C-alpha cells in the first residue's frame, strides 16, 4: 500500500469519526436521545483519547441539556468498564455500596465504613472509589487514613478480597482513559454525565449494588442502567436530600430484582431504628472520619453513627439474600457492631493490602 493511499484512508477515517460525533451532537440538540450503541461508541472515542476538547465539551453539554436517559448512561458505563484495567477474582456474588456524591451534606464516610462491616458480615465487598471530589473525605482518603493500601495492583486487590472479604479498586488506577476528559470537566465547572458514572463503572461488575444518588429523579434511570449492565440486585436510594438511606426523613428507593423494578419509600422505622438529624452525622477531614469509623468498628460508635452503618449493611444483607428483611438485616448488623468483630476485618485488610 502506498504512502498516499494510507494517508487517504487516515483522512477518510478521521472524516467519518468527525461526522459521527457531529451527527450525535446535532441529534442531541434536536432533543433526540442516543442509542446504547451510539453512546458506547462515543465514549470509546473519549476513553481512547480520540475526541477533541471542543467536540467533548459540545457532546457533554448537549447530553446535559437534553437530559441523559438510561441507554445513554449504560452505553457510557459499558465503555468505561470495557476500557478499564481488568480485575479478576475467584469470589462470586460481589457487592458494592457507594454514592454519586454531590449532595453537599459532608457526612462521615458512611458507605466506606459500611463496606468493611458488610465484609465482616460475610459479603464479598469490592469497593470502587476515589479521593474526595465533593466532600471533606472520599473513600480513598478514609481508607488511606485507616492504614489500608489504596493503590493495590489487581492481583493484590484480588488476594485481599479472597483473604478478607473486602477490597478496594482505586478509580484513577483502573480508568486511565478518564484523564482525556479531565481538562474539559474542570473547565466546564458544571455537572455532566461523568458525575453519575462513578458508581456504575466498578471493574468487578458487582452483581449486588447499593447506590445513592444526589437527585431523586436519577433513581429510576440508574436502576434501568444497572439492569442493562447485567446487575442482578440493587437498591438506588435518595434520602431526603442526600445520596444515602436517610435517618432524618423518608428515603426514595428504586429496587432492581433480577430484571424487575419496583419503587417505594423507606423510613428508619423499617429498620427498627429511631430518627436522627443529619447534623448528627456531620463529618470533617479524613483523620476525624477515620476516628469515627474506628469507634464504629470497635463497637464503641455513637448511636447515630451506628444507625447510619446499620441501614446500609442491612440493605446489602437483604440484597445478597443473607437477611429475610431489612429489619432482620438491621438486627444482625447491630449484633455484629456490638461485638467489635468488624475491627478484626479491618486489621486483616490493613495487613493483607500492605503485604
From Swiss-Prot:
Keywords: Amino-acid biosynthesis, Aromatic amino acid biosynthesis, Glycosyltransferase, Magnesium, Metal-binding, Transferase, Tryptophan biosynthesis. Mg(2+) 1 binds at residues 111, 244. This is Anthranilate phosphoribosyltransferase. It is an enzyme of class 2 (transferase). Homodimer. GO terms for molecular function: anthranilate phosphoribosyltransferase activity; magnesium ion binding. Mg(2+) 2 binds at residues 243-244. 5-phospho-alpha-D-ribose 1-diphosphate binds at residues 99, 102-103, 107, 109-112, 127-135, 139. Anthranilate 1 binds at residues 99, 130. It comes from Pseudoalteromonas translucida (strain TAC 125). Its EC number is 2.4.2.18. One of its GO terms (cellular component) is cytosol. The keyword Transferase applies. It comes from the Bacteria.
Amino acid at each position: 500500500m502506498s504512502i498516499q493511499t494510507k494517508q487517504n484512508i487516515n483522512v477518510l477515517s478521521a472524516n467519518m469519526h468527525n461526522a459521527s460525533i457531529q451527527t450525535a451532537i446535532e441529534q442531541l440538540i434536536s432533543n433526540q436521545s442516543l442509542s446504547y450503541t451510539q453512546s458506547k461508541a462515543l465514549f470509546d472515542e473519549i476513553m481512547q483519547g480520540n475526541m477533541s476538547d471542543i467536540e467533548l465539551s459540545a457532546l457533554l453539554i448537549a447530553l446535559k441539556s437534553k437530559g441523559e436517559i438510561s441507554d445513554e448512561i449504560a452505553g457510557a458505563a459499558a465503555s468505561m468498564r470495557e476500557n478499564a484495567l481488568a480485575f479478576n477474582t475467584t469470589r462470586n456474588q460481589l457487592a458494592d455500596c457507594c454514592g454519586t456524591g454531590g449532595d453537599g451534606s459532608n457526612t462521615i464516610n458512611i458507605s466506606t465504613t459500611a463496606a468493611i462491616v458488610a465484609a465482616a458480615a460475610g459479603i464479598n465487598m469490592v469497593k470502587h472509589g476515589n479521593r474526595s471530589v465533593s466532600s471533606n473525605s472520599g473513600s480513598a482518603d478514609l481508607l488511606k487514613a485507616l492504614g489500608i493500601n489504596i493503590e493495590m495492583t489487581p492481583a493484590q486487590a484480588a488476594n485481599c478480597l479472597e483473604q478478607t472479604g473486602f477490597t478496594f479498586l482505586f478509580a484513577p488506577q483502573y480508568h486511565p482513559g478518564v484523564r482525556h476528559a479531565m481538562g474539559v470537566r474542570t473547565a466546564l465547572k458544571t455537572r455532566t454525565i461523568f458525575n453519575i458514572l462513578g458508581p456504575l463503572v466498578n471493574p468487578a461488575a458487582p452483581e449486588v449494588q447499593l447506590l445513592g444518588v444526589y437527585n431523586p429523579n436519577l433513581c429510576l434511570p440508574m436502576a434501568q442502567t444497572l439492569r442493562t449492565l447485567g446487575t442482578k440486585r440493587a437498591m438506588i436510594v435518595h434520602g431526603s436530600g442526600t445520596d444515602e438511606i436517610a435517618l432524618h426523613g423518608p428515603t426514595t428507593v428504586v429496587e432492581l430484582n433480577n430484571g424487575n423494578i419496583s419503587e417505594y419509600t423507606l423510613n428508619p422505622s423499617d429498620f427498627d431504628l429511631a430518627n436522627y438529624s443529619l447534623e448528627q452525622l456531620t463529618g470533617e477531614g479524613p483523620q476525624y472520619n477515620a476516628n469515627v469509623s474506628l469507634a464504629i468498628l470497635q463497637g464503641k460508635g455513637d448511636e447515630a453513627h451506628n444507625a447510619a452503618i446499620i441501614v446500609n449493611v442491612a440493605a446489602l444483607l437483604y440484597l445478597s439474600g443473607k437477611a429475610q428483611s431489612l429489619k432482620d438485616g438491621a438486627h444482625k448488623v447491630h449484633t455484629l457492631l456490638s461485638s467489635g468483630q468488624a475491627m478484626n476485618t479491618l486489621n486483616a485488610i490493613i495487613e493483607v493490602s500492605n503485604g
